[in-house]
Amino acid sequence: MRILHILDHSLPLHSGYTFRTIAILREQRALGWETFQLTTPRQGACAALEEDVDGWHFYRTPPTPSVVVPGLREWLEMRGNAARILEVARAVKPNILHAHSPVLNALPAIRVGRCLGLPVVYEMRASWEDAAVDHGSTTEGSLRYRASRALETHALRGADQITTICEGLRRDIVGRGIAADKVTVIPNAVDVTAFAAGSPPDEALRRSLGLEGATVLGFIGSFYAYEGLDLLIEALATILQQRPEARLLLVGGGSHEPALRQLAADLGVQDKIIFAGRVPNAQVQRYYDLIDVLAYPRRSMRLTELVTPLKPLEAMAQERLFVASDVGGHRELIRDGETGFLFPAGDAAALARTIARVLDNRAAWPRLRAAGRHFVESERTWARSVARYADVYARALAARRAS
């Protein structure tokens, strides 16, 4: 089996998108399949049309001409993507074209697939229109939103098979009129061997951050508005009334960071919060080891209700204690009171109470940690998830032969 993966971006850029991609490629190689990787102009400027990064060979796509006219820019990008996909496909001769979100990859892949007689699998990791709302480039229900949704639905209809990352997105796809038997969930997972459980804290790092003797709450990830970190800061102000030793460790960065710093100052808790900044991936474990309770207070919106995140799975793999809002993406992953704790989304007071509940129930910590680890080991390994592609590819090949 030879698969050409068409990607928005990949290494050396690090993101949840990249982590999922590399996990898929690694497991597909373990199955004996040959994979080829092509990134689109959203990778950014590249020195050459082919590049080796961390042992992976990537084909790159030249940048799209700079155009500010909405619609024309995307059309030019898709035209450039189609030309490059065709060029690479003719060179590597794949059996399958596997396009991953966004739709700007899917439609060119479908066009090239029809030209070369190749089946196309489209992996919808998030809907393009909801991602645009998240990035602030449109609003739900706007003309651009509706046009983006129509384009996404058109791509879903044109693909031979569809994969997605969770049940929430699967229901959304079927709700667009796509046949249910055309859609397969390939759930997010973790490489449990990559995460240490119960590793001792780095005391030098603890001292450097001023966390000696502290009860540490934490979040590690991107600081976007939908993550609800403002609620976590508000909850900290409440928790400090009963637990003056509490501190909040925020590791990462993002567009919402200035607003978070201002909120901390307004509430008078700026000296109780450590903004550690972005840290190299190889160093992230050291920060995890300092945190007593992780928090994932995502706000409720279409994106968070439909899409499952990776972070809670990583927390379970490390036997971490965590609380999370009860958005749909979290409910699909977390068994309340068993592998983690849920609280009503958007409610800072409930978040504070839930964190206090965890801190006050130390006797249950070993059971919670073991249950989380067991869940990912038994249900959310990448080997288990990626094995599902075998049937997807077989159906795509059969559909193309029958057409």
Ranges and model annotations:
Residues 4, 211-236:
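Conserved donor-binding/catalytic core segment of Leloir-type glycosyltransferases
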Residues 336-337, 341-348, 357-363:
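Conserved acidic donor-binding segment of nucleotide-sugar-dependent glycosyltransferases
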Residues 92-96, 160, 272, 288-305, ...:
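Acidic donor-binding loop of glycosyltransferase active sites
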Residues 168, 189:
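Carbohydrate-associated surface elements
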Residues 1-63, 239, 383, 403:
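N-terminal subdomain of nucleotide-sugar transferases
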Residues 258-285:
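Nucleotide-activated donor-binding/catalytic signature segment of Leloir-type glycosyltransferases, i.e.
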Residues 296, 314-317, 321-324, 334:
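Short hydrophobic beta-strand element within catalytic cores of glycosyltransferases
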